[in-house]
């Protein structure tokens, strides 16, 4: 079901958007929707290879430098921001890529965008009902305090370049953890609507999964999307072997090959 929202009234003044211009005459535009509890720079290993594309990566409320309200912590709200920003920029011929929670954001956004805006959708280990199967694995991820802090420092160094010691980092981590709990609640609350959003996708869609993903159960997600969600004529799906949730980092070369096939040839092999 579509939200009754006027995209023209959505305030995008606080939305941070990273831009990397094409080094060659741009043939297409890529817009990347990042996932849960990350900074857009975690996709840098791949985005730096996109010399033929203008590349944009928004940072959602709760993940960027600005403050936020609880009602802004929602994949649907992130989608509203994304749509309003794309419409304002008047972008067309877009390849829309969503990783993890970003897959939900991208799919919600398609419900509001004008048809000519997006040429194809790429879903990288996307959020879905299948996540419920791995709920306890997700909950236990980075369970130890030192592991949480170490991961947070690596991920959000671009956001907090001036923090001097672990005490300062821990304060930011505590605030971030509180934000994540609220966002998690909203994500689960919206899952049924996400299911409906996936079913409305009519443009070419590419589903790329990681073989050893601790967050998205690979086989269940593959079957779920192919059997119940996106129509078979619109969806191509593949799996990157020996890879983890952030497949673009864990198996970089295989991921780049898969993305090359998608971007240049509109195809996706079953295995990479």
From Swiss-Prot:
Source organism superkingdom: Bacteria
Asked if the record carries the keyword Zinc-finger, the reply is no
Into which EC class is this enzyme placed? hydrolase
Classification via Pfam families: Abhydrolase_6
Q: Specify whether Hydrolase is a keyword of the entry.
A: yes
Q: One GO molecular-function annotation for this sequence? A: carboxylic ester hydrolase activity
* EC number, UniProt record: 3.1.-.-
The UniProt keyword set, sorted, is: Hydrolase, Serine esterase
Its family remark reads: Belongs to the lipase/esterase LIP3/BchO family.
Alphabetical list of PANTHER family matching this protein: HYDROLASE, PUTATIVE (AFU_ORTHOLOGUE AFUA_2G14860)-RELATED (PTHR43798:SF33), MONOACYLGLYCEROL LIPASE (PTHR43798)
Name recorded for this polypeptide: Putative esterase/lipase 3
* Origin species: Mycoplasma pneumoniae (strain ATCC 29342 / M129 / Subtype 1)
